[in-house]
Amino acid sequence: IANQKDGCTLLEITEALDIPKSSAFDIVKTLLYKKMIVEDQNHGKLKYKMGINAFIIGSGNIERLDLVEAAKNQLIETANHFNATAFLAILDNKMVTYLYKYEAPHRIVTNANIGTRKPIYSTALGKCLLAFQRKPEVIKDILKEIDFKPLTEYTITSPQKYLKELKRVKNIGYAVDFQEDSIYQICIAAPIFNHNKNVVAAISCTFLYDTNLRIKEIGEEMKRIALTISKKLGYIDDTGRRNIHGK
């Protein structure tokens, strides 16, 4: 249907898919219900064209591809520099969803891959994606639905402590997960913003737990890299005054 400017008739769909007309009708009916396609009778024949929801989904995927393209080279360079595993993630249905992953040659092995979904409260990525939301009600609504189950002995399980942690993250401009999601792992993340200054993603590097890890230095570097990526997405830095990256 998407490839036909004037849309398709039910017969054309049936022939293209090589399925019974009744089966094609069931598919069309479902797509109409989901607003993925719409009916068009302008030319005397009933045809089906792409609907608004198909456009919205397609646009969302394009934005995600643009996001990965903007961040990819920076993440590869950063992971190799720190000998770490780098991630790019977004907030999707109140879960952290990984869009991109790069592992340096001698990196720490992680169980997260592209498409993996993790709780927002146990990851540094999640902290960034929530702490920098511009509307306080968004944070409150998400916090209400979080079931703070301990994933390790270090997981924050108190809504009050987590809210305090979010305030700290917003103040310093980056987030740290101290073995809160996976034991023996530390994750350091920073937020990515779009042209409207909305947080749209976050990047992170994962390290093996080490008391000598230079967390502040790495955090500042992650902020710098995230800012570079944000500018590729049209974000304009507020030079000369405190900006949303905590500077």
Task: Tell me what each language-model feature is.
Residues I108-E180:
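Short, solvent-exposed recognition segments
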Residues Y235-K247:
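Short, highly charged C-terminal tails/helix-capping segments
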Residues L151-T228, K232, H245:
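Extended hydrophobic
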Residues L88-N93, K101-Y102:
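Short hydrophobic alpha-helical segments used for membrane anchoring or interfacial signaling
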Residues A2, G126, L130, R134, ...:
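Short amphipathic alpha-helical signal-transduction/dimerization elements
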Residues I52-A79, T110:
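Conserved segment of winged-helix/HTH DNA-binding domains
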Residues A16, A70-H81, I172, T228, ...:
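Amphipathic alpha-helical regulatory segments at dimerization interfaces
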Residues I1-R64:
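N-terminal helix-turn-helix
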